């Protein structure tokens, strides 16, 4: 059997855009024959993986995995091109499986996660096979693993488009759920003011000064006005400063709620699917027609 070198794998990948592991398998099956390996990939993937890999994946789901004792957990975002595929059972199973691997195996990054065993292959080969089967690109975008100081509580909202994990010290399960729901609704940027970048605060300060100046406020008052604006901004974007969404009086902040319950938040992570990804907007009718055509082609 011919030796399969990294250069051969790279060459085949360059010709087909197929995943590295699939290229290596094809070359092995073809005993090193490049043309035959290319044909094997064409038959196996129908060129779907290659074509799909260049398209933007801005839909998808957020998945979480938390241990029974609430001490270990993870949150992960896996993207697809359309919401239709994001609801596919195999896509959901892939996402949940990846979340469990992150929690249990602690991979350093997406590349390390992709190399972990899954089923009869790896995460990457499983993902690639699903891309070939469905004909739509899907990518593991990001994840966070948690080792709780307290107990982890999660919340998934809107068809898994928003996910939250909270590390709650003290309190009970209901408090954790309430906090996670609040975070999903109010979208704080950080736990407290120490987590807000200084440059962001400086931008808010400059904008406030310019607005006050344009409004004709005295120069001597500009700094005081800016400081008030910054403090209001901090209340709006920090979890502890925000008004609790379920506050009976409409005034109780999260910080006050936690003090009342004798609890604290060690940290949290909020994921929103596609956040920061430039999404291509297609005509809805055209998208439905494309999905129907793809389904018909598989019959």
UniProtKB/Swiss-Prot annotation:
The keyword NADP does not apply. This is Elongation factor Ts. InterPro entries: EF-Ts_dimer_sf, Transl_elong_EFTs/EF1B, Transl_elong_EFTs/EF1B_dimer, Transl_elong_Ts_CS, UBA-like_sf. Keywords: Cytoplasm, Elongation factor, Protein biosynthesis. The gene is tsf. Associates with the EF-Tu.GDP complex and induces the exchange of GDP to GTP. It remains bound to the aminoacyl-tRNA.EF-Tu.GTP complex up to the GTP hydrolysis stage on the ribosome. Belongs to the EF-Ts family. HAMAP family: EF_Ts. GO terms for molecular function: translation elongation factor activity. It comes from Dechloromonas aromatica (strain RCB). It comes from the Bacteria. Pfam families: EF_TS (PF00889). GO terms for cellular component: cytoplasm. CDD domains: UBA_EF-Ts (cd14275). Its main location: cytoplasm. The keyword Transferase does not apply. Residues 82-85 are annotated as: Involved in Mg(2+) ion dislocation from EF-Tu. It is found in: Cytoplasm.
């Amino acid at each position: 059997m011919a030796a399969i070198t990294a250069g051969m794998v790279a060459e085949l990948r360059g010709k087909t855009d197929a995943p590295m592991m699939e290229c290596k398998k094809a070359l092995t099956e073809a005993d090193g024959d490049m043309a035959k390996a290319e044909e094997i990939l064409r038959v196996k993937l129908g060129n779907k993986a290659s074509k799909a890999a260049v398209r933007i994946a801005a839909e998808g789901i957020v998945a979480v995995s938390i241990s029974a004792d609430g001490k270990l957990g993870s949150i992960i975002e896996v993207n697809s091109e359309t919401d239709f595929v994001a609801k596919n059972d195999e896509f959901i199973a892939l996402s949940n499986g990846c979340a469990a691997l992150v929690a249990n195996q602690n991979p350093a990054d997406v590349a390390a996660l992709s190399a972990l065993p899954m089923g009869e292959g790896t995460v990457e080969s499983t993902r690639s096979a699903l891309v070939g089967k469905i004909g739509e690109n899907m990518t593991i975008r990001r994840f966070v693993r948690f080792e709780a100081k307290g107990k982890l509580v999660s919340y998934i909202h809107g068809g898994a488009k928003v996910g939250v994990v909270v590390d709650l010290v003290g309190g009970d399960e209901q408090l954790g759920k309430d906090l996670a729901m609040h975070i999903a609704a109010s979208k704080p940027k950080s736990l407290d003011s120490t987590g807000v970048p200084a440059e962001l605060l400086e931008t808010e300060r400059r904008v406030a000064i310019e607005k006050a100046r344009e409004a004709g406020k005295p120069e001597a008052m500009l700094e005081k006005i800016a400081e008030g604006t910054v403090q209001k901004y901090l209340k709006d974007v920090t979890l502890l400063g925000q008004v609790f969404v379920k506050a009976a009086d409409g005034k109780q902040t999260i910080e006050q709620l936690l003090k009342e319950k004798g609890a604290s938040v060690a940290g949290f992570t909020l994921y929103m699917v596609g956040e920061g990804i430039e999404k291509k907007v297609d005509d809805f009718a055209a998208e439905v027609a494309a999905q129907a055509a793809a389904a018909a082609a598989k019959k």
